[in-house]
Swiss-Prot record:
Keywords: Cytoplasm, Molybdenum cofactor biosynthesis. InterPro entries: Cytidine_deaminase-like, FdhD. This is Sulfur carrier protein FdhD. HAMAP family: FdhD. It comes from Burkholderia cenocepacia (strain ATCC BAA-245 / DSM 16553 / LMG 16656 / NCTC 13227 / J2315 / CF5610) (Burkholderia cepacia (strain J2315)). The active site is at 124 (cysteine persulfide intermediate). It is found in: Cytoplasm. Required for formate dehydrogenase (FDH) activity. Acts as a sulfur carrier protein that transfers sulfur from IscS to the molybdenum cofactor prior to its insertion into FDH. One of its GO terms (molecular function) is sulfur carrier activity.
Length: 278
């Protein structure tokens, strides 16, 4: 599943662009240059049919598309995706991208039955859903592989300390979210950034799927709050623990409990708040 690109751009954007700005400090105005995170419309096309247009940072798009397909339940496993093509239109009046996925017929038929057309605002996970009845609020139970029993007491503190070093785009722009994959000691093994927190998680999940990693043998550390969609995505792929820097929502806590997933928020080097698993 190697992405192919249009003739317009041979290398993916790095996720930030430099722009001239006027900076006011202490009453003095100065001209300077600053970096801002890129935000592009990215169309996700399944078997030739456009299913979603998400607003995201145009890098790691293959991983993003695979993660979206898995975490939204469009496909059950990575092998259900037969081919994938990333097309970048960097020189268009509105820079945008398309990701074409060829999925097995069973998955495509189920997708058409869902009649779901998303028009995402910066990675919004339920934009465009046609009715409340279509909300997926009954997660599968996360398998108990013994990972939580192996989790080091200082794993969350260690991950909180290490995350900034994996946020190159955030350091450059000050405005992106990060999703990191951590082992039982809290060491960060992979991290992805995006203007949308859901997109960052999808990129991480897609990367894990593409590398055939065991998604039950680690935890996710997020730079954002814990919303229902993020917890639901993690539960779908069997991730046993979601840790976030900011607050959880009430529905995120309910979904975590229903899935048997441990949800921990307000994570700092000095402590955290555990919302339980049952």
């Amino acid at each position: 599943m190697n992405p192919t690109q249009s003739d317009e751009l041979r290398d993916e954007p790095r996720g930030a662009i430099e722009l001239p700005v006027s900076r006011t400090r202490g009453g003095a105005v100065d001209t300077a240059h600053d970096f801002v995170g890129q935000e592009w419309p990215v169309a996700l096309v399944f078997n030739g049919i456009s299913h979603a247009v998400m607003m995201c940072t145009p890098c790691d798009l293959e991983a993003f598309a695979v993660g979206f397909a898995i975490s939204e339940g469009i496909v059950a496993r990575g092998s259900d995706i037969k081919d994938i093509e990333v097309i970048l239109h960097a020189d268009a009046p509105l820079p945008h991208a398309e990701v074409h996925l060829d999925v097995v017929q069973q998955a495509f038929a189920a997708l058409k039955d869902r009649r779901r057309a998303l028009a995402g605002r910066t990675g919004c996970g339920v934009c465009g859903i046609e009715s409340i009845d279509l909300l997926d609020l009954a997660p599968e139970r996360v398998p108990d592989t013994g990972f939580l029993a192996r989790l080091a007491p200082d794993a969350l503190a260690r991950a909180a300390h290490a995350l900034p070093a994996h946020q190159a785009l955030t350091k450059l722009t000050g405005g992106l979210h990060a999703a990191a994959w951590c082992d039982a000691t809290g060491a960060i093994r992979a991290a992805f950034e995006d203007v949308g927190r859901h997109n960052a998680l999808d990129k991480l999940i897609g990367s894990l799927v593409l590398s055939r990693a065991d998604t039950t043998d680690g935890f996710v550390f997020l730079s954002s709050r814990a919303s229902y969609e993020l917890v639901r995505k993690a539960a779908r792929v069997g991730i046993p623990l979601v840790a976030t820097i900011s607050a959880p929502s009430s529905l995120a806590i309910e979904i975590a409990k229903a899935a048997g997933l441990r949800l921990v928020s307000f994570c700092r080097e000095t402590g955290h708040v555990d919302y339980g698993t049952v």
